[in-house]
Amino acid sequence: WIMGHMVNAIAQIDEFVNLGANSIETDVSFDKNANPEYTYHGIPCDCGRTCTKSEKFNVFLQGLQKATTPGDSKYQVKLVLVVFDLKSSSLYDNQASDAGKKLAKSLLQNYWKNGNNGGRAYIVLSIPNLTHYKLITGFKETPKTEGHPELMEKVGYDFSGNDDIDQVAKAYKKAGVTGHVWQSDGITNCLPRGLDRVKQAVANRDSSNGFINKVYYWTVGKRSTTRGALDAGVDGIMTNYPDVIADVLSESAYKSKFRIATYEDNPWETFKN
């Protein structure tokens, strides 16, 4: 999965997919009542990027729905996965469940169109704080109560705080999550970061009793870093430059080992090295 980083304006969806992304990451900010409000990152962000592009969250979802619905004039067949980077650190721990419910409601109405030919992309909810595990339980309740439990087949999870892998496992246990787990590791492209924790995550994925299904590394812009991440066995790379990642994947060392995921590839299925 080539994951376009910080895609917060509808116009950027086409821009990143046309550069080679088959997945995008979108920031979601919340208001003080735990309603998802804007697709917005804010300052500071990555080196070489504008940090302040945004849309109202529901408006962005409507644009995203068009981009991921076959037959729509804006349809992008390659776009198969969306990571919502939930900026939930602004919330109190006791608001996490509400935030999850409200987020699910918003997706149900504006993206899934209440189960009536909505967008088809797989969704990963990426949460920065382990203490906000109730965001997941709140989210999961909503499609059930609204009569569309099948939509949860399209939803996966990620804790993005670079926490100890054992602590991440405990948070999922509390949230009642078994499966659909992506594990991120990384740092802003302005700073270097080694691959030690990525390798730990890959080892968990590849072990017989691991809880991780997929591992992705962020935010990568250099060819050398891309090669290092691929050599470590990641499933996804988040980048500001999808064309760079696509270039490296076409090198002879990688093109026989990796291919770009399509809609037919199940993002919750573990593919071991």
UniProtKB/Swiss-Prot annotation:
Cofactor(s) of this protein: Mg(2+)
- Cofactor, how bound (note): Binds 1 Mg(2+) ion per subunit.
- EC numbers on record: 4.6.1.-
Residues binding Mg(2+), per UniProt: E25, D27, D85
Q: Which UniProt keywords apply?
A: Cytolysis, Dermonecrotic toxin, Disulfide bond, Hemolysis, Lipid degradation, Lipid metabolism, Lyase, Magnesium, Metal-binding, Secreted, Toxin
Q: Which residues form the active site?
A: H5, H41 (nucleophile)
- The keyword tRNA-binding is annotated on this UniProt entry: no
Alphabetized SUPFAM superfamilies for the sequence: PLC-like phosphodiesterases (SSF51695)
Subcellular location, in the record's words?
Secreted
Name the GO terms of the biological process aspect: killing of cells of another organism; lipid catabolic process
Entry protein name: Dermonecrotic toxin LdSicTox-alphaIB3avi
User: Which source organism does the UniProt entry give?
Assistant: Loxosceles deserta (Desert recluse spider)
